């Protein structure tokens, strides 16, 4: 076992072993064949030394579904983790698998009925580059090889003066930035980072602390609360080669303008769908240039409360256009989502409309892409063998709130992550009931630009 692998000891079973190795650049395609008895075989294709590499078949195919999950390496997409479900009925085997990349989450492939055990292959700050496992008539075991993710380096913007410095990109996040200004422009900038284990690192200062200046209030980023630094706008004076102003934006808030933004050449550091995790640049008596290290923003799975029959997972999309559900007798029976993917609507239906009596249909429409679904609040009640959802309330990024749809009960749940949009749902249901509801969230640019101002100091 390589030190770059992550062992899945809980389901390592006897059977013919296979090992694709770890000398690959990336995973490109994963093929699965199976049925209600489990995943029968798996085939993984890779990129090695920049060229496609077809992987061998592992297992045996006796018919059933065939599904392929493709990873677009040309768009810098890579495989982050694999989740799955396994059982020991008629010998242990894997019943269902789900893939997560840095850009999206697949639906559950296979059958994930109630009572299956769950496993996960993931290593923070790493991507999957190879697999090994065991398979006979079914896929019995799965393990992965990992390698660290390399952040993207954005070139420094600003003047040509000063001494080069580089904090690197091997951080988990930026947590605080503080600036001091003087009559020349930005005198110094200080950064606080946390490492991959979540521990604070030594503060980094670039520029000069000597002479007259004015230290501004620090700009703090609450990474533990899913706040991320998305971009920095600035300007620099071409004659002096000194950065004059900076303005910071997260998915939750935007700072005031730090310095004088009325003169100089403007620049922006940042890339859509990415967060800034490190900096480099040049400085001497003042800050002359600033560059950044960026990495892809992370999707967050908001787990559901409750339990029930079949587990389902729609995966993730660009946004949600409409939610519809059917209820009667004070119980939500069926829920339907209209998602947006590549500009087209894709509909997913979970639950069923079996039962007695007439059904009431409720709908909530979102003005995507001008509006995002940001919160779902629901109520549920206990029921023998599980839980039953009774009502749902929706909120959007435009501060719209739906009425309570359904019949509220006394137990509540909330699907929300501040500064994030809900881009997919998962849960548990049967042909008669919706038992539980969870979601996926993704950071969005702050829509509230009010209150932005500039700090100017006269000398």
UniProtKB/Swiss-Prot annotation:
Domain spans labelled Jacalin-type lectin: 2-148, 151-296, 298-443
Gene Ontology MF: a single term: carbohydrate binding
The keyword Methyltransferase is assigned to this record: no
Record key words, sorted: Lectin, Repeat
Family, per entry: Belongs to the jacalin lectin family.
The protein's name: Jacalin-related lectin 12
Upper classification of the organism: Eukaryota, Viridiplantae, Streptophyta, Embryophyta, Tracheophyta
Gene this protein is translated from: JAL12
């Amino acid at each position: 076992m390589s030190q770059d692998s992550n062992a899945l000891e809980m389901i390592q079973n006897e059977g013919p072993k296979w090992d694709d190795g770890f000398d690959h650049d990336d995973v490109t395609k994963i093929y699965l064949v199976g049925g209600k008895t489990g995943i029968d075989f798996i085939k993984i294709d890779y990129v090695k030394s920049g060229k496609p590499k077809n992987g061998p078949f592992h297992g045996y195919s006796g018919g059933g579904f065939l599904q392929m999950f493709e990873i677009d390496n040309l768009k810098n997409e890579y495989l982050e983790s694999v989740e799955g479900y396994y059982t020991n009925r008629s010998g242990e085997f894997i019943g269902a698998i789900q893939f997560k990349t840095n850009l999206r989450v697949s639906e559950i492939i296979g059958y994930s009925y109630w009572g299956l055990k769950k496993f996960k292959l993931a290593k923070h700050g790493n991507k999957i580059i190879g697999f090994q496992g065991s398979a006979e008539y079914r896929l019995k075991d799965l393990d992965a090889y990992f390698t660290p993710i390399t952040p993207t380096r954005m070139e420094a913007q600003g003047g040509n003066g000063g001494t080069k410095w580089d904090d690197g990109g091997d951080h988990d996040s930026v947590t605080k930035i503080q600036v001091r200004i003087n009559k020349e422009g930005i005198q110094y900038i200080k950064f606080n980072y946390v490492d991959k284990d979540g521990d604070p690192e030594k503060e980094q200062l670039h520029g000069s602390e000597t002479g007259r200046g004015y230290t501004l209030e620090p700009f703090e980023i609450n990474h533990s609360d899913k706040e991320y630094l998305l971009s920095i706008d600035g300007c620099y004076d071409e004659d002096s080669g000194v950065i004059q102003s900076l303005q910071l934006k997260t998915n939750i808030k935007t700072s005031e303008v730090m310095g004088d933004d009325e003169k100089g050449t403007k620049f922006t550091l940042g890339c859509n769908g990415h967060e800034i995790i490190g900096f480099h640049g040049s400085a001497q008596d003042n800050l002359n240039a600033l560059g950044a290290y960026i990495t892809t923003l992370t999707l967050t799975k908001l787990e559901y409360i409750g339990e029930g029959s079949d587990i389902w997972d729609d995966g993730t999309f660009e946004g949600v256009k409409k939610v519809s559900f059917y209820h009667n007798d004070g119980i939500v029976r069926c829920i339907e989502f209209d998602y947006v993917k590549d500009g087209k609507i894709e509909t997913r239906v979970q639950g069923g409309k079996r039962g007695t009596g007439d059904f009431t249909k409720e709908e909530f429409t979102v003005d995507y892409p001008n509006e995002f679904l940001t919160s779902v609040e629901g109520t549920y009640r206990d029921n023998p063998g599980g839980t039953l959802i009774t009502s749902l309330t929706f909120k959007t990024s435009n501060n719209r709130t739906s009425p309570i749809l359904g019949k509220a009960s006394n137990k509540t749940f909330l699907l929300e992550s501040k500064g994030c949009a809900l881009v997919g749902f998962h849960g548990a249901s049967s042909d008669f009931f919706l038992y539980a509801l969870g979601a996926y969230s993704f950071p969005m640019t702050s829509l509230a630009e009010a209150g932005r101002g500039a700090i100017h100091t006269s000398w």
